[in-house]
Regions:
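Compact beta-sheet-dominated domain cores in extracellular/mature segments
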Residues: 1-382
């Protein structure tokens, strides 16, 4: 099996010995042992509209003989991973695929393609994905006008930020980046309709790639917006409470603020009685809500690093009362960054970033000069 290269606008990219382009898949961005049989995300069981199989659209490059590196490919980078009793070729640990949309040698129709819950890219001799210059623009969605990228094929994919990220810093790596592919670029991203060019920046990720930022916030796509046949403007990742990523995911407004939509606060049973919680995203994960002892009525003292570990419960407009909660006790306060935070009996409400999957993981937690307590439906901190 010969793996060689050809020239492209991105640099030299990997191809088969017969000149067919080779691709990598963001869904494979998780640690695995190349010696063990594993179930890779792109399988014959992963079917899109019309029961189209992922491996039918993106056939794995199988190791049919000794691996031979040519044309600048690094021999040490070639390897295999076992899948369904056959060996798939890898390059620097990432499985390689072909694309059925490439009808002839030299075609690169799978580049920057969104399908089967991930992004597909050509692979460079360095082992990094071939990324062009990305573009940011606004897109109308069910939640209103939000930030999107038209760079993917088919285009206009909604972009998200993670509450646990610091300014110009990402905390979403490894398995997280498989579910939330970062928006990458080969240089400074371009500003499309409705986007301020001065707000666009980049950060260098741990693997050396450049991720786009907007107003200092790293931006991502969501794998479940990238399925085969998925339409532009999907916001399946909106208000998603993601325990694996330690934070809350939001779509991004044109001004760079997170867009939480309208938040509904409900009650749930606990060992401390009825306490407040929020159900977030399409996965309906429940998250306990907390109050902070230094706060006063409608005044939050949790800012900066505190607000990263204890994200404020945000809302767009007046929050709604769910089961067991009185609407008259809900309110809002305007934070220093312009976002609206939900209050209950005047108490500003927070999530605990490292326990965002229900339960009282952050109860009676001393931090940042105070103590965080769960909030009862009666407004007490317990």
């Amino acid at each position: 099996m010969v793996v060689t290269t050809t020239t492209s606008k991105f640099g030299r990219v990997l191809v088969t010995g017969s000149g067919r382009s080779l691709y990598v898949f963001t869904g494979d961005n998780f640690p695995f042992s190349a010696k063990s049989a594993i179930q890779l995300p792109c399988t014959a069981l992963n079917k899109g509209p019309g029961k189209f199989e992922c491996t039918a659209a993106w056939p794995p490059l199988l190791a049919t003989g000794p691996l031979v590196a040519r044309g600048g490919v690094r021999q040490a980078g070639l390897g295999t991973v076992t899948r369904n009793h056959v060996k798939q070729v890898t390059y620097f640990g990432r499985p390689l695929y072909r694309f059925v949309g490439d009808a002839a040698a030299g075609q690169k129709n799978g580049q920057n393609f969104a399908a089967f819950d991930g992004m597909w890219y050509l692979d460079l001799t360095s082992g990094r994905s071939a990324i062009g210059v990305s573009t940011l623009q606004t897109e109308r969605s069910a939640n209103g006008v939000v930030l999107a990228s038209p760079t993917a094929t088919p285009g206009r994919r909604t972009l998200y930020t993670l509450s646990f990220d610091g300014k110009n810093m990402t905390t979403c790596t490894g398995a997280c980046s498989a579910l939330w592919p970062p928006l990458l670029t080969s240089g400074r991203a371009k500003a499309g309709a409705g986007v301020s060019r001065s707000a666009i920046g980049t950060i260098r990720r741990s693997n050396g790639s450049l991720q786009v930022t907007y107003h200092g916030h790293p931006v991502y796509m969501f794998a479940f917006d990238l399925g085969a046949g998925a339409k532009p403007g999907l916001t399946n990742g909106q208000y998603l409470i993601d325990a694996a990523a330690s934070g809350v995911w939001y779509t991004v407004l044109p001004n760079g603020r997170p867009d939480p939509g309208t938040t509904t606060v409900r009650s749930e049973s606990s060992s401390d009685g009825k306490i407040l919680s929020v159900t977030g995203g399409f996965n309906h994960a429940r998250a306990t809500l907390y109050g902070f002892t230094p706060d006063t009525a409608r005044v939050s003292k949790c800012n900066g690093q505190c607000a990263i570990f204890w994200p404020p419960v945000l809302t767009k407009g007046r929050p709604k009362a769910g089961a067991g909660v009185s609407q008259s006790h809900l309110g809002t306060l305007r934070r220093s960054d312009g976002t609206l935070q939900v209050t209950y009996f005047g108490h500003p409400l927070y999530f605990f970033a490292q326990a965002l999957n229900s339960g009282l993981g952050g109860d009676a937690f001393p931090a940042f000069g105070g103590i965080f307590y769960a909030v009862t439906v009666g407004g007490a901190l317990v």
